[in-house]
Swiss-Prot record:
Residues 11-48 are annotated as: Disordered. One of its GO terms (molecular function) is DNA binding. Residues 242-262 form the ELK domain. The lineage of its organism: Eukaryota, Viridiplantae, Streptophyta, Embryophyta, Tracheophyta. Expressed predominantly in shoot apices. Also found to a lesser extent in glumes. CDD domains: homeodomain (cd00086). It comes from Oryza sativa subsp. japonica. This is Homeobox protein knotted-1-like 6. PANTHER family: HOMEOBOX PROTEIN TRANSCRIPTION FACTORS. Disruption phenotype: Early termination of shoot meristems, reduced leaf formation and reduced seed setting. One of its GO terms (biological process) is negative regulation of DNA-templated transcription. It holds the Pfam family KNOX2. Belongs to the TALE/KNOX homeobox family. Interacts with FTIP7.
Length: 361
């Protein structure tokens, strides 16, 4: 220990050797290192050394004045020498790792398949991108490919089987990824094209459509339907004329039959004015018992131009809405007479029973 201390010029504040006192100046780095690697000896050892050689060691302390001026060894002594060594190793390993990464990047860029790999990656970026973005990506790919060709012409390409396998596998993965990205986009575009075609099909001028629907309709159908409903005008500007004429020719018969069917349904819902007036006249004459016989229904059908089903439906609805049996007629309904049979007992305001004929009201 004395040799280490003497080498760094470190002893106690005062030392006794052969009865003489020697004073030495403290070396700051020596004090720091001695404090780390050589702590003060225990009291028993100090007593033995004093008895044997007459030399006494005082505990070594850190030179705080040296710490104030930023002595590096003293700063390490204030922390941990092992931590400092570990950090130095980590920094060295990190630098080595970074160097390896840069070397791998350089090998990938200089590989002959790098241009294909880059093109596959940019193709993935182009999926769904606006045209101007896709154009910029194409220009970037061309520029990088030109640079790589120049570099390969100067340096040449080194073969490395593992790197070749990596480049091929990664390129295949990017191609499949682009296909997965493109598939839903293509399906969406196809759907939009179908919708556009259907809209173009519907974009037929209202006038032409009305002419088709009106063909084959009789004057009676138009009166029975209460007049033809005006269709809204549709602007056919920009529609392909050839497609329009083709569709009109193909579906004109179907549209005409559809028009006739709709007219019949409207006719059933609302009877012609003249026919309805004749039925109302009969209703007023037979208000007390508005149940026409079968022969009367046939006569009404002939005079109005309606069928028997329309006649029956009109009288049923009219009785439900506008007629209530009189008190004298209630017993006819309560005794279970059918309205058709009951009409045979009622003639010109008289009701016939077993006792003869008598007048109601």
């Amino acid at each position: 220990m004395e040799e280490i201390s003497h080498h760094f010029g470190v002893v106690g504040a005062s030392g006794v050797h052969g009865g003489h006192q020697h004073q030495h100046h403290h070396h700051p780095w020596g004090s720091s290192l001695s404090a780390i690697v050589a702590p003060p000896p225990p009291p028993q050892l100090q007593q033995q050394q004093t008895q044997a050689g007459g030399m006494a060691h005082t505990p070594l302390t850190l030179n705080t004045a040296a710490a104030a001026v930023g002595n590096p060894v003293l700063q390490l002594a204030n922390g941990s020498l092992l931590d400092a060594c570990g950090k130095a190793k980590e920094a060295s390993a990190s630098a080595s790792y970074a160097a390896d990464v840069e070397a791998i990047k350089a090998k990938i860029i200089s590989h002959p398949h790098y241009s294909s790999l880059l093109a596959a990656y940019l193709d993935c970026q182009k999926v769904g991108a606006p045209p101007e973005v896709a154009a910029r990506l194409t220009a970037v790919a061309q520029d990088l490919e030109l640079r790589q060709r120049t570099a390969l012409g100067v340096l040449g390409a080194a073969t490395e089987p593992e790197l070749d396998q990596f480049m091929e596998a990664y390129h295949e993965m990017l191609v499949k990824y682009r296909e997965e990205l493109t598939r839903p986009l293509q399906e969406a575009m196809e759907f939009l094209r179908r919708v556009e075609t259907q809209l173009n099909t519907l974009s037929i001028s209202g006038r032409s459509l009305r002419n088709i629907l009106s063909s084959g309709s009789s004057e009676e159908d138009q009166e029975g339907s209460g007049g033809e409903t005006e269709l809204p005008e549709i602007d056919a500007h920009g529609v392909d004329q050839e497609l329009k004429h083709h569709l009109l020719k193909k579906y004109s018969g179907y549209l005409s039959s559809l028009k006739q069917e709709l007219s019949k349904k409207k006719k059933k819902g609302k009877l012609p004015k003249d026919a309805r007036q004749q039925l109302l006249n009969w209703w007023e004459l037979h208000y007390k018992w508005p149940y026409p016989s079968e022969s009367q229904k046939v006569a009404l059908a002939e005079s109005t131009g309606l069928d028997l089903k329309q006649i029956n439906n009109w009288f049923i609805n009219q009785r439900k809405r506008h007629w209530k049996p009189s008190d004298e007629m209630q017993f006819v309904m309560m005794d279970g007479y059918h309205p058709t049979n009951a009409a045979a007992f009622y003639m010109d305001g008289h009701f016939i029973n077993d006792g003869g004929l008598y007048r109601l009201g």
